[in-house]
Amino acid sequence: MMLRVETQQLDGALICRLEGRFTGEGAEEVRRLVTRCDNQLELVVDLTDVMFIDAIGEEVLLFVKRLGAQFVAETSYSRDVCERLQLPSIGKRKPNMQVPGNSDGNGHRPRRL
């Protein structure tokens, strides 16, 4: 699986939701994306659906941390990454954060057959 990046502006925050493998060129593209964004917005990076992060991805996360980002990590892998890299975690997604493909309002996506 490749990297999927979704952004949403909500309540004075830019939420950047990552899904898949946060590696190489995809990670560098996220670095470019966040540096072009309005720095008046709080930056929140949701790592919950990230399955793998390579050294470049870790470097980008540390860069984003230096910009003042906070991180959402709801899985054991994403929590481990936040702990290991000492990324400030805010716990769960904001309740009114839109989750594309959401069918039940609780972040559960319909199964694909």
Task: Label each residue range with its predicted role.
Residues 1-113:
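STAS-like cytosolic regulatory interaction modules
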